[in-house]
Amino acid sequence: MANQSRPKVKKSRALGIALTPKAVKYFEARPYPPGEHGRGRKQNSDYKVRLLEKQRLRAQYDVSERQLVRAYERAAKTQGKTGEALVIELERRLDALVLRSGIARTIYQARQMVVHGHIEVNGQKVDKPSFRVKPDDVVMVRERSRQKPLFEVAREGGFAPDGETPRYLQVNLRALAFRLDREPNRKEIPVICDEQLVVEYYAR
């Protein structure tokens, strides 16, 4: 599991993206990097710009460097734009789609739901957050877990994302279930990232 020892709000501010709902409030009050010199402007080298973008992508999916490299290697073998393929690879992770569906509030919570054995795919328990969901796969909360308070909140829409549910998902929160209808399109994926900079970072 990726190292999450650094406070998530501070990490969010350092990367310039809100990784949790709580971080959104901090952005409104403190729209600058953490630390007493956070308000000052800094000139970043091309390398640092690419590194930051890579870290932003990693953080939004809560993956390790090794996991991101593997996803990049798979994406590089596909036709089309490598950067878009990379984001799509990450979006097909089980924990990412549990988050998108509204069953979980954050990527961290989604990961824990999977690791603790609360999620099944096509009727089989899956406890690996990195499991790659395929089109037509049906994902749902296991029967034995549905009465837990956390999932009662999810069933009532308490964790539903702002705006529309991504069109590549068919979600039934009352049933705590969703289906991946098709492969996501990069433009539909709610991730803040200039993926071309990530490609340039790894291609250097």
Curated annotation (Swiss-Prot):
SUPFAM superfamilies: Alpha-L RNA-binding motif. GO terms for cellular component: small ribosomal subunit. It comes from the Bacteria. Keywords: Ribonucleoprotein, Ribosomal protein, RNA-binding, rRNA-binding. One of the primary rRNA binding proteins, it binds directly to 16S rRNA where it nucleates assembly of the body of the 30S subunit. With S5 and S12 plays an important role in translational accuracy. HAMAP family: Ribosomal_uS4_B (MF_01306_B). GO terms for molecular function: rRNA binding; structural constituent of ribosome. Part of the 30S ribosomal subunit. Contacts protein S5. The interaction surface between S4 and S5 is involved in control of translational fidelity. The keyword Ribonucleoprotein applies. It comes from Streptomyces avermitilis (strain ATCC 31267 / DSM 46492 / JCM 5070 / NBRC 14893 / NCIMB 12804 / NRRL 8165 / MA-4680). InterPro entries: Ribosomal_uS4, Ribosomal_uS4_bac-type, Ribosomal_uS4_CS, Ribosomal_uS4_N, S4_RNA-bd, S4_RNA-bd_sf. Belongs to the universal ribosomal protein uS4 family. Gene3D superfamilies: Ribosomal Protein S4 Delta 41, Chain A, domain 1, RNA-binding S4 domain. Residues 92-157 form the S4 RNA-binding domain. Pfam families: Ribosomal_S4 (PF00163), S4 (PF01479). GO terms for biological process: ribosomal small subunit biogenesis; translation. The gene is rpsD. PROSITE patterns: RIBOSOMAL_S4, S4. This is Small ribosomal subunit protein uS4.
